[in-house]
């Protein structure tokens, strides 16, 4: 059965400006600008109200999978709004049993070098996604802090670091060494 119309709205805060070019959404905020292309999804995007402070996503004559894209697009736009206002921060911790993992940040936080992983001489180099900055925590030992505006780029950079320290040819229940995400949050604290 097809539903005639399914729609959802996203409220836009005062300090955020959204512009639409077809199905491309551009979000401007205090921390910067994010753009995302939704051309591959057959939906209507429109700004409502006199001050254009509400985004509506419409899906006409959709089946179950097509109707699910309405909420997905709203979630993506909400993440973009959160990114340009608060920013996203992931904290990662080094875990090791014997050989201490040595992490060095190069090129202004865009390249992570992992040395002495399981005592290996090989240097693992992980390049951060564009717009993601990495730094070593001053407050906590063996902690990395990744920050940026785009949640997908920040989380993908964290995943690349974690995957660079996978243990090969050993029992992973025993060899738990690696760099893992310990905390997910925002750069600035939300005012409640």
Curated annotation (Swiss-Prot):
Predominant cellular place of this UniProt entry's protein: cytoplasm
One GO term (biological process): cytoplasmic translation
A GO molecular-function annotation: rRNA binding
Transport is among the record's keywords: no
GO CC terms: cytosolic large ribosomal subunit
SUPFAM superfamilies: Ribosomal protein L6 (SSF56053)
Role of this protein: Component of the large ribosomal subunit. The ribosome is a large ribonucleoprotein complex responsible for the synthesis of proteins in the cell.
Complex formation: Component of the large ribosomal subunit.
Family classification: Belongs to the universal ribosomal protein uL6 family.
Protein's UniProt name: Large ribosomal subunit protein uL6
Species the sequence originates in: Pongo abelii
Gene: RPL9
């Amino acid at each position: 059965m097809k539903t005639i119309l399914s729609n959802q709205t996203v409220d836009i805060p005062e300090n955020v400006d959204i512009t639409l070019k077809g199905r491309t959404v551009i979000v401007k905020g205090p921390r910067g600008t994010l753009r995302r292309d939704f051309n591959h999804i057959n939906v209507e995007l429109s700004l409502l109200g006199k001050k254009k402070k509400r985004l509506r996503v419409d899906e006409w004559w959709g089946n179950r999978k097509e109707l699910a894209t309405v909420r997905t697009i709203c979630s993506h736009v909400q993440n973009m709004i959160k990114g340009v206002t608060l920013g996203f921060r992931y904290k990662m911790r080094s875990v090791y049993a014997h050989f201490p993992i040595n992490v060095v940040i190069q090129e202004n936080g865009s390249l992570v070098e992992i040395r002495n992983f399981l005592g290996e001489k090989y240097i693992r180099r992980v390049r951060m996604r564009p717009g993601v900055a990495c730094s070593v925590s001053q407050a906590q030992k063996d902690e990395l802090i990744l920050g940026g505006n785009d949640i997908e780029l920040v989380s993908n950079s964290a995943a690349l670091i974690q995957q660079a320290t996978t243990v090969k040819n050993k029992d992973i229940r025993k060899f738990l060494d690696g760099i893992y995400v310990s905390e997910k949050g925002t750069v600035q604290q939300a005012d409640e």
